[in-house]
């Protein structure tokens, strides 16, 4: 009898955990961090979800996109517009466009300046991604085939 109560308790606990996991709503968030990086966090983020972030590229810096924390099936489209949204020097036309897939990372060069970055989910995604800058070491290459191309 004691063993049966234990089994029933464990089954009840398993059902509660399963039901609570099923109730989570999809999440897609983009945030600009104090360390001059952009974080993308998603849990079953629906296709076409969108967010904005800001990034400053200095002299002799390159942009790093890292989606190694995102599920392999996920894909993000990134558009880098020169200037800060709402400022006089903001351009609605992207200076650079690229995409990054889950599990991949890439490095590319960009002109120094401030950028408004539009992040768009090209598929349903789960996981994390990060966009940041780092000092250029003279050898800039894409980790995969997702090197950005200027749109001008």
Predicted regions and their residues:
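Bacterial N-terminal signal peptides that target proteins for export
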Residues: 1-11
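Transition segment at domain starts
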Residues: 23-56, 142-150
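C-terminal motif of bacterial Sec signal peptides marking the signal peptidase cleavage site
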Residues: 17-21
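Edge beta-strands of jelly-roll/beta-sandwich modules across compartments, strongly enriched
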Residues: 74-76, 123-143
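Beta-sandwich interaction modules
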Residues: 53-56, 96-111
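Post-signal-peptide N-terminal segment of Sec-exported extracytoplasmic proteins
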Residues: 41-79
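Short, surface-exposed beta-strand/strand-loop-strand elements in extracellular ectodomains
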Residues: 73-92, 132-134
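Noncatalytic modules at the cell exterior or secretory-pathway interfaces
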Residues: 61-65, 107-125, 129
């Amino acid at each position: 009898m004691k063993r049966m109560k234990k089994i029933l308790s464990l089954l009840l606990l398993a059902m509660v955990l399963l039901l609570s996991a099923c109730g989570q709503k999809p999440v897609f968030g983009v945030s600009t961090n104090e360390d001059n990086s952009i974080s993308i966090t998603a849990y079953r983020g629906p296709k076409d979800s969108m967010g904005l972030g800001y990034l400053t590229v200095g002299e002799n810096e390159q942009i790093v996109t890292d989606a190694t924390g995102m599920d392999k099936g996920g894909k993000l489209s990134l558009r880098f517009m020169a200037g800060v949204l709402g400022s006089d020097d903001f351009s609605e036309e992207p200076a650079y466009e690229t995409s990054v897939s889950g599990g991949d990372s890439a490095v590319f060069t960009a002109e120094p300046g401030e950028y408004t970055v539009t992040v768009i989910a090209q598929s349903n995604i789960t996981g994390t991604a990060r966009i940041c800058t780092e000092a250029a070491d003279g050898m800039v290459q894409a980790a995969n085939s997702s090197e950005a191309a200027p749109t001008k």
